[in-house]
């Protein structure tokens, strides 16, 4: 499971011209589900993302998490994070989980954030073309992989 985590002042997502999710200060999370991912991957990434200390404290040091500041999350599914571009010029998405499995794990990821941490969150729409507007704060962008590839 892969995530691109961006610290944002504001972020929202539109589907077919309609706003379906919006947050203020917090994290924009683009989430890709890999074939073979499961509950352990969800647990690892949710815990890592919610407790990642990338918000500034009173001294300007990155020392606070989204949980510490009472921030929000916008979680958007993005299978293209699993694209392999090592050969040729067209990404290969063979490592991405099937849509059925990816949707199930995506929903479990969202539920875990809400249930275990009680954070306010919004989501995109699975398997839909989305327009995402992100107002980066910093910018601060972190790449995470549950298999700890980077």
Curated annotation (Swiss-Prot):
Record's catalysed reaction(s): glycyl-tRNA(Ala) + H2O = tRNA(Ala) + glycine + H(+); a D-aminoacyl-tRNA + H2O = a tRNA + a D-alpha-amino acid + H(+)
Predominant place of localization: cytoplasm
Positions occupied by motif Gly-cisPro motif, important for rejection of L-amino acids: 138-139
Keyword Transferase: no
Keywords, comma-separated and alphabetical: Cytoplasm, Hydrolase, RNA-binding, tRNA-binding
EC class of the enzyme, as a word: hydrolase
CDD domains the record matches: Dtyr_deacylase (cd00563)
Keyword flag Hydrolase: yes
GO molecular function: D-tyrosyl-tRNA(Tyr) deacylase activity; Gly-tRNA(Ala) deacylase activity; Ser(Gly)-tRNA(Ala) hydrolase activity; tRNA binding
InterPro entries (UniProt xref): Daa-tRNA_deacyls_DTD (IPR003732), DTD-like_sf (IPR023509)
Disulfide bonds: none
Cellular localization per UniProt: Cytoplasm
SUPFAM superfamilies: DTD-like
EC number: 3.1.1.96
Any GO BP annotation: D-amino acid catabolic process
Pfam families from the UniProt entry: Tyr_Deacylase
A GO cellular component annotation in the UniProt record: cytoplasm
Membership in a protein family: Belongs to the DTD family.
Subunit structure: Homodimer.
Role noted for this protein: An aminoacyl-tRNA editing enzyme that deacylates mischarged D-aminoacyl-tRNAs. Also deacylates mischarged glycyl-tRNA(Ala), protecting cells against glycine mischarging by AlaRS. Acts via tRNA-based rather than protein-based catalysis; rejects L-amino acids rather than detecting D-amino acids in the active site. By recycling D-aminoacyl-tRNA to D-amino acids and free tRNA molecules, this enzyme counteracts the toxicity associated with the formation of D-aminoacyl-tRNA entities in vivo and helps enforce protein L-homochirality.
Domain notes: A Gly-cisPro motif from one monomer fits into the active site of the other monomer to allow specific chiral rejection of L-amino acids.
HAMAP family: Deacylase_Dtd (MF_00518)
Protein name: D-aminoacyl-tRNA deacylase
Lineage, broadest ranks: Bacteria, Bacillati, Bacillota, Clostridia, Natranaerobiales
